[in-house]
Curated annotation (Swiss-Prot):
This is Small ribosomal subunit protein bS20. It comes from the Bacteria. Coiled coil: none annotated. It holds the Pfam family Ribosomal_S20p. Belongs to the bacterial ribosomal protein bS20 family. One of its GO terms (cellular component) is small ribosomal subunit. It comes from Yersinia pestis. One of its GO terms (molecular function) is small ribosomal subunit rRNA binding. Binds directly to 16S ribosomal RNA. InterPro entries: Ribosomal_bS20 (IPR002583), Ribosomal_bS20_sf (IPR036510). One of its GO terms (biological process) is translation.
Amino acid sequence: MANIKSAKKRAVQSEKRRKHNASRRSMVRTFIKKVYAAIAAGDKDAAQKAFNEMQPIVDRQSCKGLIHKNKAARHKSNLVAQINAMQ
């Protein structure tokens, strides 16, 4: 454990940020899973709706640095391709 006052403060701030980021990361993963679940169920309308809900959230979190922008782009690209491939 830190002895210096500023180091203690940084440890508290770091833990607070870790919890906040974990919550946001979990939310992003949940929205992505909803799209994959709709695709697996074969429901194109539900998949499109879930994707439209997921896209701005993923973009917002990638702009804030929670996930890398290339990872966000990769998720969106793969999901759009799978939705378009559905009958």
